[in-house]
Amino acid sequence: MREALKIIALTVGLSCAYGIAHDQITARVCIEYFTIGHFSPANIPWTPTVLGLYWGIVATWWVGLILGIPLALCACVGSWPKRSAQELLRPLLLLLAITFACAMTGLVISRLTNFTAPPHLLPMVLNDDQAARFSADLVTHNISYGVG
């Protein structure tokens, strides 16, 4: 039971760390993705750094939990060889590195091609430049969720 909790804590912690790193970049590409595209509590100075920290945790802890519970069950229950959190660290880091590389590739391609998402996916208050940057963030986040 203790090892299962370690595995769940590991996946939640790594997910949050990934989310913070990811959102530190995307908040600087398009702050409107976070301020207009998402509900953010009032009375907080929403700088790109604060947004990246806040959304990096809020948007990813649950992904780590959803992945961690079945991973812990597979690693700790049944007749197959048991796996520790330590043994799972390297494969999880590899998964996050691949996910990050794919997401950043999507971000770069989106920006280089000036991709703009279909209008129904964008807030109406954005100008053309904001729409392209918002679209790049949208692509980057969707790649992270899809690959990860």
Task: Enumerate the predicted regions with their spans.
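Hydrophobic alpha-helical membrane-insertion segments
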Residues: 10-22, 90-113
